Amino acid sequence: GPEPDAGIYLRGTPQVQIWDTARTNVGAEVGSGGLYNNQQNPSKPLKVADQKVGEWNTFLIRMIGERVSVWLNGELVTDNVILENFWDRSQLIFPVEQIELQAHGSKVAYRDIFIKEIPRPEPFKLSSEEEKEGFRILFDGTNLDQWTGNKRDYAVESGNIVLHPSQGSGGNLYTKDQFDNFVFRFEFMLTPGANNGLGIRTPLEGDAAYMGMELQILDNDAPVYEKLAIYQYHGSVYGVIPAKRGFLKPVGEWNYQEVIADGDHIKVILNGTTILDGNIREASKNGTMDKREHPGLLNKTGHIGFLGHGSKVKFRNIRIKELK
């Protein structure tokens, strides 16, 4: 039709763009297949792959988690890009919604529409022992409903929380609830040179390493970290208590970690080995190792958070038991 302009909504959200590349007055020369309404993530296709107006085009669209790939006439035009939530950009895209065929007052025809659902990972479940002990799940691999903060760069993919830092930092993702004394269990996978942190008893604002407490999550074998201070290695209470070294799995393998926070006593168990066992009040009574102020070190309660430092990291199977 005149000035063709249409699209395909995924999970009720616009849209994979369809338009006439001759409409240069609206930017259509970039081609169809882009995620038109994106603002933070790429919105334009990688190349022009459209047929002439009046000829049939073939789309293959794949969506896994929040990420979309689009092939137009056999050409990859959108490569694993996050589809932003047009209706509320502070939130992730809806986990389940309808697919919609859209047109802007011009004639467009669709035919031969097929769909194949991709199985979702089975939600993580507690062991019977953990159920008896009173653990509860904070992340089961399916959603971030119990979390707040940067849900743009921390995304659910294949049963994991995956941090894709877009602006060089990655930002922070926090539990909605606050916790005082607890046993916190999770698994994580590092990439080469990765740097993250586990904030505990921290507020939602400010630097968690000082306004709360940060337990390092770090590929400290990477050459870039060869001159670390002893209180900066993985598992350390940052700036306060150093952890033992040498117990991380190789980069690309899953690590299992347990953190016990009981009053002033902090314990970190990595892959079955206790790498930190200390008292934050005793360790800081004559000043901290980094000689900086840590006003939140002795907080009684606060949020638990993953603290991004510009690196891709994966997390899974997150659960907690509150201690009385």
Where do the model's predicted regions map?
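Carbohydrate-interacting regions of secretory-pathway proteins
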Residues: 1-324
